A protein has these predicted regions:
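C-terminal lobe and pocket-closing loops
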Residues: 121, 207-276, 286, 305-308
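An extracytoplasmic/periplasmic, membrane-proximal ligand-sensing/linker region
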Residues: 26-28, 172, 260-322
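N-terminal (or domain-start) structured segment
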Residues: 21-111, 150, 158, 174-199, ...
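A ligand-binding cleft/hinge motif common to bilobed small-molecule-binding domains
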Residues: 94-104, 168-172, 199-233
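N-terminal export leaders
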Residues: 3-8
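Short coil/turn segments
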Residues: 34-38, 92-93, 121, 129-134, ...
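N-terminal signal peptide c-region/cleavage motif recognized by signal peptidases
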Residues: 16-18
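Hinge/capping helix and adjacent helix->loop/strand transition within the periplasmic-binding protein
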Residues: 79-85, 100-187, 236, 249-282
Protein backbone atom coordinates (compact mmCIF):
# COMPACT_ATOMS: atom_id res chain seq x y z
CA UNK A 1 0.00 0.00 0.00
CA UNK A 2 2.80 2.40 0.94
CA UNK A 3 4.57 1.58 -2.33
CA UNK A 4 1.42 2.39 -4.36
CA UNK A 5 0.99 5.69 -2.50
CA UNK A 6 4.63 6.57 -3.20
CA UNK A 7 4.25 5.82 -6.93
CA UNK A 8 1.06 7.90 -7.06
CA UNK A 9 2.79 10.79 -5.29
CA UNK A 10 5.72 10.65 -7.70
CA UNK A 11 3.33 10.66 -10.66
CA UNK A 12 1.57 13.76 -9.35
CA UNK A 13 4.93 15.45 -8.77
CA UNK A 14 6.03 14.62 -12.30
CA UNK A 15 2.88 16.17 -13.73
CA UNK A 16 3.57 19.33 -11.77
CA UNK A 17 7.15 19.69 -12.98
CA UNK A 18 6.47 21.54 -16.26
CA UNK A 19 4.57 24.28 -14.46
CA UNK A 20 7.24 24.57 -11.78
CA UNK A 21 10.01 24.59 -14.39
CA UNK A 22 8.46 27.31 -16.58
CA UNK A 23 11.24 29.73 -17.51
CA UNK A 24 11.07 33.15 -15.93
CA UNK A 25 13.41 36.04 -16.80
CA UNK A 26 15.51 37.23 -13.88
CA UNK A 27 16.26 40.70 -15.26
CA UNK A 28 15.01 43.12 -17.97
CA UNK A 29 14.66 41.66 -21.46
CA UNK A 30 16.10 43.47 -24.50
CA UNK A 31 14.71 43.54 -28.03
CA UNK A 32 17.55 44.60 -30.32
CA UNK A 33 16.51 46.43 -33.50
CA UNK A 34 19.12 46.39 -36.31
CA UNK A 35 18.09 49.80 -37.66
CA UNK A 36 17.76 53.39 -36.45
CA UNK A 37 14.72 54.53 -34.43
CA UNK A 38 11.52 55.39 -36.26
CA UNK A 39 11.50 52.67 -38.91
CA UNK A 40 9.05 49.79 -39.14
CA UNK A 41 11.21 47.23 -37.25
CA UNK A 42 11.64 49.76 -34.44
CA UNK A 43 7.90 50.47 -34.28
CA UNK A 44 7.07 46.77 -34.22
CA UNK A 45 9.55 46.11 -31.39
CA UNK A 46 8.10 48.95 -29.32
CA UNK A 47 4.55 47.75 -30.01
CA UNK A 48 5.40 44.27 -28.69
CA UNK A 49 7.55 45.42 -25.76
CA UNK A 50 4.74 46.61 -23.47
CA UNK A 51 2.50 43.51 -23.60
CA UNK A 52 5.55 41.23 -23.43
CA UNK A 53 6.74 43.02 -20.29
CA UNK A 54 3.36 42.44 -18.66
CA UNK A 55 3.42 38.76 -19.63
CA UNK A 56 6.97 38.16 -18.36
CA UNK A 57 6.85 40.35 -15.28
CA UNK A 58 10.04 42.14 -16.28
CA UNK A 59 10.75 45.37 -18.19
CA UNK A 60 11.31 44.91 -21.93
CA UNK A 61 13.72 47.45 -23.39
CA UNK A 62 14.20 48.29 -27.07
CA UNK A 63 17.79 48.85 -28.17
CA UNK A 64 18.64 50.24 -31.62
CA UNK A 65 21.95 49.05 -33.11
CA UNK A 66 22.07 50.17 -36.76
CA UNK A 67 24.92 49.43 -39.13
CA UNK A 68 25.85 47.38 -42.19
CA UNK A 69 22.25 46.79 -43.20
CA UNK A 70 21.47 45.02 -39.93
CA UNK A 71 24.59 42.86 -39.77
CA UNK A 72 26.11 44.77 -36.83
CA UNK A 73 23.17 43.94 -34.57
CA UNK A 74 22.97 40.36 -35.83
CA UNK A 75 26.63 39.75 -34.99
CA UNK A 76 26.26 41.32 -31.54
CA UNK A 77 23.25 39.18 -30.63
CA UNK A 78 24.83 36.02 -32.07
CA UNK A 79 27.80 36.54 -29.74
CA UNK A 80 25.67 37.64 -26.77
CA UNK A 81 24.68 35.68 -23.69
CA UNK A 82 22.25 32.85 -24.60
CA UNK A 83 20.14 33.29 -21.49
CA UNK A 84 16.77 34.28 -22.95
CA UNK A 85 17.10 37.94 -22.04
CA UNK A 86 18.02 39.20 -25.53
CA UNK A 87 15.91 38.99 -28.69
CA UNK A 88 16.68 40.35 -32.14
CA UNK A 89 14.26 41.64 -34.75
CA UNK A 90 15.33 39.59 -37.77
CA UNK A 91 14.50 40.98 -41.21
CA UNK A 92 15.10 39.93 -44.82
CA UNK A 93 18.40 41.78 -45.13
CA UNK A 94 20.65 40.29 -42.44
CA UNK A 95 18.81 36.94 -42.31
CA UNK A 96 18.23 36.05 -45.97
CA UNK A 97 19.78 38.53 -48.40
CA UNK A 98 23.19 38.87 -46.75
CA UNK A 99 23.62 35.11 -46.09
CA UNK A 100 22.71 34.42 -49.72
CA UNK A 101 24.81 37.10 -51.41
CA UNK A 102 27.71 38.01 -49.10
CA UNK A 103 31.09 36.40 -49.49
CA UNK A 104 31.61 36.37 -45.74
CA UNK A 105 29.56 37.20 -42.67
CA UNK A 106 30.56 37.33 -38.98
CA UNK A 107 27.59 35.09 -38.13
CA UNK A 108 25.74 32.05 -39.47
CA UNK A 109 21.95 32.21 -39.32
CA UNK A 110 21.38 28.46 -38.85
CA UNK A 111 24.29 27.95 -36.44
CA UNK A 112 24.09 31.09 -34.32
CA UNK A 113 20.37 31.71 -33.81
CA UNK A 114 17.21 30.01 -32.59
CA UNK A 115 13.91 31.23 -34.02
CA UNK A 116 11.12 32.29 -31.68
CA UNK A 117 8.36 33.35 -34.09
CA UNK A 118 7.61 35.05 -37.39
CA UNK A 119 6.03 38.36 -36.38
CA UNK A 120 4.51 39.32 -39.72
CA UNK A 121 5.01 40.47 -43.29
CA UNK A 122 4.46 43.69 -45.19
CA UNK A 123 4.47 44.85 -48.80
CA UNK A 124 7.12 47.27 -50.01
CA UNK A 125 6.33 50.25 -52.20
CA UNK A 126 8.48 51.82 -54.91
CA UNK A 127 8.43 55.59 -54.39
CA UNK A 128 9.81 58.40 -56.55
CA UNK A 129 10.44 62.09 -56.02
CA UNK A 130 7.91 64.23 -57.95
CA UNK A 131 10.73 66.10 -59.71
CA UNK A 132 11.49 62.93 -61.65
CA UNK A 133 8.27 63.47 -63.59
CA UNK A 134 7.24 59.80 -63.54
CA UNK A 135 3.80 58.52 -62.53
CA UNK A 136 4.30 54.83 -63.40
CA UNK A 137 7.09 52.30 -63.19
CA UNK A 138 7.27 52.16 -66.99
CA UNK A 139 7.91 55.91 -67.05
CA UNK A 140 10.64 55.53 -64.41
CA UNK A 141 12.32 52.88 -66.57
CA UNK A 142 12.10 55.07 -69.67
CA UNK A 143 13.65 58.05 -67.85
CA UNK A 144 16.40 55.90 -66.35
CA UNK A 145 17.28 54.42 -69.74
CA UNK A 146 17.54 57.92 -71.19
CA UNK A 147 19.80 58.98 -68.30
CA UNK A 148 21.95 55.91 -67.48
CA UNK A 149 23.74 56.12 -64.14
CA UNK A 150 22.10 59.43 -63.18
CA UNK A 151 19.28 58.18 -60.97
CA UNK A 152 20.04 57.41 -57.32
CA UNK A 153 18.06 55.17 -54.99
CA UNK A 154 18.19 55.18 -51.20
CA UNK A 155 18.14 52.16 -48.91
CA UNK A 156 18.20 51.47 -45.17
CA UNK A 157 21.71 50.02 -45.51
CA UNK A 158 23.95 47.76 -47.55
CA UNK A 159 22.51 44.27 -47.83
CA UNK A 160 19.02 45.37 -46.80
CA UNK A 161 15.99 44.24 -48.76
CA UNK A 162 15.36 47.89 -49.66
CA UNK A 163 18.71 47.84 -51.49
CA UNK A 164 18.34 44.43 -53.05
CA UNK A 165 14.77 44.90 -54.24
CA UNK A 166 15.91 48.00 -56.14
CA UNK A 167 19.04 46.24 -57.41
CA UNK A 168 16.85 43.38 -58.60
CA UNK A 169 14.39 45.80 -60.18
CA UNK A 170 17.22 47.65 -61.93
CA UNK A 171 18.66 44.41 -63.26
CA UNK A 172 15.34 43.05 -64.51
CA UNK A 173 14.31 46.32 -66.17
CA UNK A 174 17.74 46.91 -67.69
CA UNK A 175 18.37 50.29 -66.08
CA UNK A 176 21.54 51.63 -64.45
CA UNK A 177 21.04 53.23 -61.03
CA UNK A 178 23.31 54.26 -58.14
CA UNK A 179 22.82 52.95 -54.59
CA UNK A 180 23.02 55.42 -51.68
CA UNK A 181 22.79 53.61 -48.30
CA UNK A 182 21.45 55.25 -45.14
CA UNK A 183 21.31 54.08 -41.52
CA UNK A 184 17.55 53.57 -41.39
CA UNK A 185 14.15 54.20 -42.92
CA UNK A 186 13.72 57.69 -41.45
CA UNK A 187 17.00 58.83 -42.98
CA UNK A 188 16.27 57.20 -46.35
CA UNK A 189 12.82 58.81 -46.56
CA UNK A 190 14.30 62.20 -45.61
CA UNK A 191 16.74 61.89 -48.51
CA UNK A 192 13.90 61.13 -50.92
CA UNK A 193 11.78 64.02 -49.62
CA UNK A 194 14.72 66.38 -50.04
CA UNK A 195 15.34 65.21 -53.59
CA UNK A 196 18.82 63.94 -52.73
CA UNK A 197 17.75 60.62 -54.28
CA UNK A 198 15.05 59.93 -56.84
CA UNK A 199 13.96 56.40 -55.87
CA UNK A 200 13.27 54.35 -52.75
CA UNK A 201 11.71 50.96 -52.06
CA UNK A 202 10.41 50.76 -48.50
CA UNK A 203 7.51 49.60 -46.33
CA UNK A 204 4.24 51.60 -46.40
CA UNK A 205 4.62 52.90 -42.83
CA UNK A 206 7.38 55.25 -43.90
CA UNK A 207 5.92 56.33 -47.25
CA UNK A 208 2.11 56.55 -47.16
CA UNK A 209 1.94 59.68 -44.93
CA UNK A 210 3.82 61.69 -47.57
CA UNK A 211 1.73 60.62 -50.56
CA UNK A 212 -1.37 62.70 -49.79
CA UNK A 213 0.80 65.79 -49.39
CA UNK A 214 2.22 65.25 -52.86
CA UNK A 215 5.77 65.00 -51.57
CA UNK A 216 6.33 61.57 -53.12
CA UNK A 217 4.64 59.30 -55.64
CA UNK A 218 4.11 55.55 -55.41
CA UNK A 219 4.64 53.86 -58.79
CA UNK A 220 4.58 50.16 -57.86
CA UNK A 221 4.44 47.64 -55.04
CA UNK A 222 6.84 44.73 -54.73
CA UNK A 223 4.53 42.00 -53.42
CA UNK A 224 3.21 39.17 -55.55
CA UNK A 225 -0.32 40.60 -55.24
CA UNK A 226 -1.74 44.07 -54.65
CA UNK A 227 -1.99 45.18 -51.05
CA UNK A 228 -5.38 46.50 -49.86
CA UNK A 229 -3.44 49.48 -48.54
CA UNK A 230 -2.84 50.75 -52.08
CA UNK A 231 -5.27 48.78 -54.26
CA UNK A 232 -4.89 51.14 -57.21
CA UNK A 233 -1.10 50.79 -57.38
CA UNK A 234 0.03 47.92 -59.65
CA UNK A 235 2.63 45.38 -58.65
CA UNK A 236 5.98 45.34 -60.40
CA UNK A 237 4.86 42.15 -62.15
CA UNK A 238 1.69 43.86 -63.39
CA UNK A 239 3.81 46.76 -64.65
CA UNK A 240 5.41 44.55 -67.26
CA UNK A 241 8.05 42.65 -65.30
CA UNK A 242 6.51 39.24 -64.50
CA UNK A 243 7.76 37.08 -61.65
CA UNK A 244 9.04 39.96 -59.52
CA UNK A 245 8.22 39.67 -55.80
CA UNK A 246 10.15 41.06 -52.82
CA UNK A 247 7.93 41.37 -49.72
CA UNK A 248 9.31 42.29 -46.29
CA UNK A 249 9.04 40.08 -43.21
CA UNK A 250 10.10 40.28 -39.59
CA UNK A 251 10.91 37.49 -37.14
CA UNK A 252 12.20 37.35 -33.58
CA UNK A 253 15.26 35.26 -32.75
CA UNK A 254 17.57 34.56 -29.81
CA UNK A 255 21.17 33.29 -29.59
CA UNK A 256 21.43 29.62 -30.59
CA UNK A 257 22.25 28.13 -27.18
CA UNK A 258 19.37 29.81 -25.39
CA UNK A 259 17.71 27.21 -23.10
CA UNK A 260 14.77 25.47 -24.83
CA UNK A 261 12.48 26.34 -21.93
CA UNK A 262 13.25 30.05 -22.46
CA UNK A 263 12.53 29.78 -26.20
CA UNK A 264 9.30 27.93 -25.44
CA UNK A 265 8.11 30.60 -22.97
CA UNK A 266 9.06 33.49 -25.25
CA UNK A 267 7.30 31.85 -28.20
CA UNK A 268 4.15 31.13 -26.20
CA UNK A 269 3.86 34.70 -24.95
CA UNK A 270 4.78 36.39 -28.24
CA UNK A 271 2.55 34.19 -30.40
CA UNK A 272 -0.37 34.91 -28.08
CA UNK A 273 0.34 38.65 -28.15
CA UNK A 274 0.78 38.82 -31.94
CA UNK A 275 -2.40 36.83 -32.65
CA UNK A 276 -4.58 38.85 -30.27
CA UNK A 277 -7.33 40.89 -32.02
CA UNK A 278 -6.13 44.15 -30.50
CA UNK A 279 -2.61 43.51 -31.82
CA UNK A 280 -3.96 43.00 -35.32
CA UNK A 281 -5.36 46.51 -35.10
CA UNK A 282 -2.06 47.92 -33.87
CA UNK A 283 0.10 46.06 -36.39
CA UNK A 284 -2.07 46.09 -39.52
CA UNK A 285 -4.29 49.14 -39.16
CA UNK A 286 -1.51 51.39 -37.88
CA UNK A 287 1.73 49.89 -39.21
CA UNK A 288 0.60 47.81 -42.19
CA UNK A 289 2.10 44.60 -40.85
CA UNK A 290 0.11 41.42 -41.49
CA UNK A 291 0.54 39.61 -38.12
CA UNK A 292 1.52 35.92 -38.15
CA UNK A 293 2.82 34.64 -34.78
CA UNK A 294 4.18 31.40 -36.25
CA UNK A 295 5.91 28.47 -34.60
CA UNK A 296 9.73 28.58 -34.43
CA UNK A 297 9.88 25.81 -37.04
CA UNK A 298 7.68 27.72 -39.49
CA UNK A 299 9.79 30.86 -39.06
CA UNK A 300 12.99 28.92 -39.74
CA UNK A 301 11.44 27.38 -42.86
CA UNK A 302 10.45 30.77 -44.27
CA UNK A 303 13.96 32.12 -43.76
CA UNK A 304 15.55 29.08 -45.42
CA UNK A 305 13.25 29.46 -48.42
CA UNK A 306 13.94 33.20 -48.66
CA UNK A 307 17.70 32.63 -48.47
CA UNK A 308 17.51 30.06 -51.27
CA UNK A 309 15.43 32.49 -53.36
CA UNK A 310 17.95 35.31 -53.01
CA UNK A 311 20.82 32.94 -53.75
CA UNK A 312 19.10 31.96 -57.03
CA UNK A 313 18.53 35.63 -57.86
CA UNK A 314 22.15 36.44 -57.12
CA UNK A 315 23.43 33.66 -59.37
CA UNK A 316 21.03 34.51 -62.20
CA UNK A 317 21.63 38.26 -62.20
CA UNK A 318 25.22 38.30 -60.98
CA UNK A 319 24.36 40.29 -57.83
CA UNK A 320 26.79 40.02 -54.91
CA UNK A 321 27.49 41.98 -51.74
CA UNK A 322 30.99 42.96 -50.72
Amino acid sequence: MKRRRLIAALAVSALALPALAEWQPSKPVRIVVPFAPGGQPDLVARTLAEPLARALGQPVLVENRPGAGGNVAAEAVAKGAPDGHTLLVATNGPFAVSPALSRSLPYDVERDFAFVTMVGSSPSLVAVHPSLGAATLSEVVAIAKARPGELNYASVGKGSVSQLSMALLSAETGIETVHVPYSGGVQAVAALLAGDVQLLSLVPTALIPHVAAGRIRIVAQTGATRSPLVPDVPTVAESGFPGFAAPVWMALVVPAKTPPEAVKRLHAELARIIRAPEMKERLWDRQWIDPIGSTPEEAARVVREETAKWARIGRTLGIALE
